Structure formats: C-alpha cells, structure tokens
Amino acid sequence: MEVIVVIVVIVVVIAIVIVIDSNSNSNSNNSSDSSNESNNSDSSKNGGSDIYQFSSSNKPFLHNFSNNNPNYNINAYFRI
C-alpha cells in the first residue's frame, strides 16, 4: 500500500512540474510574439528556413535529450 502511495505522489509531482513548465514556456512565447512578428521580414529573406530554429531558453522541459544528434530537433514536433 505504501509503495502505491509513493508512486502516485511521484506521478503527481512530475505532472505538476510539466504543467508549470509548459505555462512558463507559453508566457515567454507570448511576450516574444511582438519581436517575432517584427522579424518576419528577416525570415522571408532566409526563405523561411528559421521556422524551427528555437533558442535554448525555449526548449520544453524533459525534451532536451536530442543533444546526442544535433541534426535532430525534437522541438520541431512540440512547437508548431
């Protein structure tokens, strides 16, 4: 019974951390929307190739495991 309680507590803590982190990421993205809109002309000069280039500060929590392969950007699947 105690083992089940410990597992439930761990799952709840992980879920809370993910929710808090996703909220902080969405807030930081909202604050940078105006700067992204002003840079649309720059992205069009580059052929729009910078759509999936995210700064390291905007990487979602627990999704930074793609460091072994720099050509594989997992963030492209989480931020459209």
UniProtKB/Swiss-Prot annotation:
Main location class: secreted
Highest rank taxon of the organism: Eukaryota
Biased composition regions of type Low complexity, renumbered to the chain: 23-44
Glycosylation site residues: N29, N30, N36, N39, N64
Gene Ontology terms: cellular component: extracellular region
Location of the protein in the cell: Secreted
Region entry Disordered, spans: 23-52
Record field: transmembrane: none
Signal peptide from the UniProt entry: 1-15
Keyword terms: Glycoprotein, Secreted, Signal
UniProt keyword Repressor, yes or no: no
Protein name: Putative uncharacterized protein DDB_G0286451
